[in-house]
UniProtKB/Swiss-Prot annotation:
GO terms assigned for molecular function: 2,3-diketo-5-methylthiopentyl-1-phosphate enolase activity; 2-hydroxy-3-keto-5-methylthiopentenyl-1-phosphate phosphatase activity; acireductone synthase activity; magnesium ion binding
UniProt-listed Enzyme Commission number(s): 3.1.3.77
Record key words, sorted: Amino-acid biosynthesis, Hydrolase, Magnesium, Metal-binding, Methionine biosynthesis
The protein's role, per its UniProt record: Bifunctional enzyme that catalyzes the enolization of 2,3-diketo-5-methylthiopentyl-1-phosphate (DK-MTP-1-P) into the intermediate 2-hydroxy-3-keto-5-methylthiopentenyl-1-phosphate (HK-MTPenyl-1-P), which is then dephosphorylated to form the acireductone 1,2-dihydroxy-3-keto-5-methylthiopentene (DHK-MTPene).
Cofactor binding note: Binds 1 Mg(2+) ion per subunit.
Family label: Belongs to the HAD-like hydrolase superfamily. MasA/MtnC family.
Reaction equation(s) it catalyzes: 5-methylsulfanyl-2,3-dioxopentyl phosphate + H2O = 1,2-dihydroxy-5-(methylsulfanyl)pent-1-en-3-one + phosphate
Listed pathway(s): Amino-acid biosynthesis; L-methionine biosynthesis via salvage pathway; L-methionine from S-methyl-5-thio-alpha-D-ribose 1-phosphate: step 3/6; Amino-acid biosynthesis; L-methionine biosynthesis via salvage pathway; L-methionine from S-methyl-5-thio-alpha-D-ribose 1-phosphate: step 4/6
Cofactor: Mg(2+)
Protein's UniProt name: Enolase-phosphatase E1
NCBIfam families linked to this entry: enolase-ppase (TIGR01691)
Amino acid sequence: MSSVFDIDSVVLDIEGTTSATGFVVDVLYPYSRSRFGALLTERSGDPEVARAVAQVRELLGEPDADAVRVEKALNEWLDDDRKATPLKTLQGLVWSEGFARGELVSHFYDDVVPALRAWHAAGVRLHVYSSGSVAAQRAWFRSSPEGDLLPLVEGLYDTENAGPKQEPESYRTIAAALGTGADRILFLSDRPGELDAARAAGWRTVGVRRPGEPYYEQGVGDHAQAGSFGGITIARSTA
């Protein structure tokens, strides 16, 4: 049964929603580990790298931590699945390089791209909100198996420019940036805590439940749910 929504904007989670968590864990995380060391040494003068390294040192409480110590911390945070902003920033830079070199191609579930194209063609504004950095999101959508999907997406949000994904204030920040009433925004995610935070900010929500994903068995509580994007219908009001 399809859920029908009269909304103006859709905000998408990536991992577990548009794309397989297994791909991120099994492909992207190992790639990050293999490239962190080179990134920290070869691009140490890059302002974005330097800022992220400073944030790592601050989180560690070790202002003099060298590149080896920083790399060790990044890998430990990966092991713990910690959503630390500097980790996500540096991952995004590493992945962007990999996508640009053709060493990486992103993953989307088969039902996702047709839905995104249809919604975009119908005038629905599409945005992304992920714990992955904006740089990583940009590379992800640009390097899909079906080509560059970035033209479909109007805005990219992460934990740095919006805030933590389980805090309602982050969703209010995004709504303000969109200039859209909260009840005209639909958030798609597989994570109950994120869905709860979005709803607390006044957004509409759908929990995307895909077999094999980490939150599939847990469910999404009393949120509307869909097993694929094909189970979500958007019928925008013309009034």
